[in-house]
UniProtKB/Swiss-Prot annotation:
Enoyl-ACP reductase of the type II fatty acid syntase (FAS-II) system, which is involved in the biosynthesis of mycolic acids, a major component of mycobacterial cell walls. Catalyzes the NADH-dependent reduction of the double bond of 2-trans-enoyl-[acyl-carrier protein], an essential step in the fatty acid elongation cycle of the FAS-II pathway. Shows preference for long-chain fatty acyl thioester substrates (>C16), and can also use 2-trans-enoyl-CoAs as alternative substrates. This is Enoyl-[acyl-carrier-protein] reductase [NADH]. NAD(+) binds at residues 20-21, 64-65, 95-96, 165, 194. One of its GO terms (cellular component) is extracellular region. Disulfide bonds: none annotated. Belongs to the short-chain dehydrogenases/reductases (SDR) family. FabI subfamily. Keywords: Antibiotic resistance, Cell wall, Fatty acid biosynthesis, Fatty acid metabolism, Lipid biosynthesis, Lipid metabolism, NAD, Oxidoreductase, Phosphoprotein, Secreted. NCBIfam families: InhA (NF040631), PRK07889.1 (NF005908). Its main location: secreted.
Length: 269
């Protein structure tokens, strides 16, 4: 993918550890020639240490998508890093959260609305608020890409996060309509299960042994169903799909979901 993103400036959100999908997207984007600006939430010193493992250094900005000041100042803070008069060409939204009450073995009906609403705010509404914050400094022809997970089925242990992903898909269609007015595309990538820190914790029993077993069965079944197979320890195919959407090679694709899951979502068994 050398040169695919040459000369492009990309904002990447959501790096937490070097197992984060966002980290691998950032790595592949840099290898493809992109200049990056990164955002982190909360433990910025830790995120900075992780970001230093990327092929090239990149500025790191603080971003809590529930903080209106962070959002309202984001464009100016990005401009301060890339230079006055310059704009960005792409945005990666790799942000998701659902309180423990809304996932795992906890009964679906028992999740408090306050927890569910927080999860939907961070996982879905923030896609629109991030787009609104950065569109004024995006070049026409650019793209916004968000991370999805197939929400068309009731996934074990995923519970209200599945609902949040359904909301994200709807939000994406409206973001595409608004962003299209300034020539910017908006799409989601629905990834197969990846062994991120959060997924590893669930499989390890962080949300209960039953939830861990369910997620492990989901992972194993994914590889069996996928016509191309699926390696949950290799996020590179997902990262490449995101970078393809950030490139100039899909100029008429917007408002949709691209699957990077080995084809498992198309198969019953």
């Amino acid at each position: 993918m050398t040169g695919l993103l040459e000369g492009k400036r990309i904002l990447v959100t959501g790096i937490i550890t070097d197992s984060s999908i966002a980290f691998h997207i950032a790595k592949v984007a840099q290898e493809a020639g992109a200049e990056l600006v990164l955002t982190g939430f909360d433990r910025l010193k830790l995120v900075k240490r992780i970001a230093d493992r990327l092929p090239k250094p990149a500025p790191l900005l603080e971003l809590d998508v529930q903080n209106e000041e962070h959002l309202s100042t984001l464009a100016d803070r990005i401009t301060a890093e890339i230079g006055e008069g310059n704009k960005i060409d792409g945005v990666v939204h790799s942000i998701g959260f659902m309180p423990q009450s809304g996932m795992g073995i906890n009964p679906f009906f028992d999740a408090p609305y306050e927890d569910v609403s927080k999860g939907i705010h961070i996982s879905a509404y923030s896609y629109a608020s991030l787009a609104k914050a950065v569109l004024p400094i995006m070049n026409p022809g650019g793209g916004i890409v968000g991370m999805d997970f197939d929400p068309t089925r009731a996934m074990p242990a995923y519970n209200w996060m599945t609902v949040a992903k359904s909301a994200l898909e709807s939000v994406n269609r409206f973001v595409a309509r608004e962003a299209g007015k300034v020539g910017v595309r908006s799409n989601l990538v629905a990834a197969g299960p990846i062994r991120t820190l959060a997924m590893s914790a669930i499989v390890g029993g962080a949300l209960g042994d039953e939830a861990g077993q369910q997620m492990q069965l989901l992972e194993e079944g994914w590889d069996q169903r996928a016509p191309l197979g699926w390696n949950m320890k290799d996020p590179t195919p997902v990262a490449k799909t995101v970078c393809a959407l950030l490139s100039d090679w899909l100029p008429a694709t917007t408002g949709t979901v691209i699957y990077a899951d080995g084809g498992a979502s198309t198969q019953l068994l």
